[in-house]
């Protein structure tokens, strides 16, 4: 039996210009590379996995998300949904991947009259997977490659969020690689005892 419980009802639901505000995340992990493998861009994408969960009473897959309530920040809401729906904890990036307007297939008549939903999505680096979580009986979780997730993702707006997630992750990897190259070059210069007056960096 789960110690935690999911929030229910919409008494504390936030709205913005008739849009129901939703917060969610893309939980991810990076599989460890084989020491003999080169760290190419293709290898990086293949090692990147995202966690999806099934919808209640259906077999389609989605990312954890739910209503953003008035007693929590948008980041707290995303973290809460990750625990409630997927049973994962981790490091949530403060900068959202984006904000998407959509109409949920499970929307109530009230939502349809108001104007649908506005979803904030974040990237969550998973550090812990819980064996038991609030919605374990109603949801299955699956680790997938980004390519698999794009094919199985039910909603178009979530596909766009996943594409943005991949772009951000690839940009960060590229930046890290460039920084490591600069660091290695600097170390080599020091070991070669090159006069620093003859060294310069082009930005």
UniProtKB/Swiss-Prot annotation:
Family: Belongs to the Nudix hydrolase family.
SUPFAM superfamilies: Nudix (SSF55811)
Gene3D superfamilies: Nucleoside Triphosphate Pyrophosphohydrolase (3.90.79.10)
Swiss-Prot/TrEMBL cofactor(s): Mg(2+); Mn(2+)
Location(s), subcellular: Mitochondrion
Role this protein plays: Probably mediates the hydrolysis of some nucleoside diphosphate derivatives.
Residues binding Mg(2+), per UniProt: 81, 85
Keyword Repressor: no
Entry annotated with the keyword Secreted: no
Superkingdom of origin: Eukaryota
InterPro entries: DDP-like_NUDIX, NUDIX_hydrolase-like_dom_sf, NUDIX_hydrolase_CS, NUDIX_hydrolase_dom
Cellular-component GO terms for this entry: mitochondrion
Domain Nudix hydrolase: from-to ranges: 18-166
Keywords: Hydrolase, Magnesium, Manganese, Metal-binding, Mitochondrion, Transit peptide
Record's protein name: Nudix hydrolase 12, mitochondrial
Disulfide pairings: none
Residue span of motif Nudix box: 66-87
Gene: NUDT12
Enzyme Commission number: 3.6.1.-
Entry-linked Pfam families: NUDIX (PF00293)
